[in-house]
């Protein structure tokens, strides 16, 4: 059977590459929001949903328009993928799997995706991304399978890359016929039916004082200033470690 697997690593971009990634993520956010706005206008006029094929022609139109020619500086594939994300959001809404698509806010969950054109050099811990060039990453494990797509995202002030691969694996056959029960709790992380007990990690308690100190420092900063943003990223990184 075929198995899809994701490998996530922290990127180590240069200063210019980081600026470009922010710009690409902003362009994808712009395309998604502008297409959603046009879909809303179309719906208010009493017309049916416009599929991806037509939305792709909007992207060509926007690239040629004087006020949005800056979209040409971003790679085409991630911009197209943002339109496919919007199409997927509408399909999930029509099938009652999700709420109606909402506008994205720049700076929150920044991400963009490459379906192809990526080169992976695991031996030297680097990856090639169109219009970004070669970039190093923290190589913590071997990537196996055929690369299907690559997603670049930002979290807690750092950039990450998620490589999705496809590989052929044999169907697993469990040799045992016995079963075991598991009870998850708060005081005890897990208790097995054979009496084995796993204690809690208590990562929050270990970092509670540090978190309180950082939050006090944040309250003294001028909201939305550079120092406030830096302090907020420190808190986000600590929350990431706790999780």
Give the positions of each predicted feature:
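Nucleic-acid substrate recognition interfaces
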Residues: 1-243
């Amino acid at each position: 059977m075929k198995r899809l697997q994701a490998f996530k690593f922290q990127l180590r971009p240069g200063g210019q590459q980081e600026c470009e990634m922010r710009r690409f993520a902003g362009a994808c956010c712009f395309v998604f929001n502008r297409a959603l706005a046009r879909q809303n206008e179309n719906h208010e006029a009493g017309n049916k949903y416009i599929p991806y094929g037509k939305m792709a022609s909007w992207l060509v139109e926007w690239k040629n328009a004087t006020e949005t020619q800056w979209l040409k500086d971003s790679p085409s594939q991630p911009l197209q993928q943002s339109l496919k994300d919007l199409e997927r959001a509408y399909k999930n809404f029509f099938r009652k799997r999700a709420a109606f698509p909402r506008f994205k806010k720049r700076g929150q969950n920044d991400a963009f995706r490459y379906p192809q054109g990526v080169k992976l050099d695991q031996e030297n811990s680097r990856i090639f991304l169109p219009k970004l060039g070669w970039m190093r990453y923290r190589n913590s494990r071997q990537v196996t399978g055929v690369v299907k797509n690559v997603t670049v995202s930002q979290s807690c002030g750092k950039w990450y890359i998620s490589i999705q691969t496809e590989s052929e694996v044999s169907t697993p056959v469990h040799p045992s016929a016995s079963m075991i029960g598991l009870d998850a709790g708060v005081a005890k992380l897990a208790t097995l039916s054979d009496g084995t007990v796993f204690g809690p990690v208590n990562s929050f308690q270990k970092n509670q004082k540090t978190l309180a100190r950082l939050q006090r420092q944040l309250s003294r900063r001028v909201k939305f200033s550079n120092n406030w943003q830096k302090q907020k990223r420190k808190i986000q990184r600590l929350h990431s470690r706790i999780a």
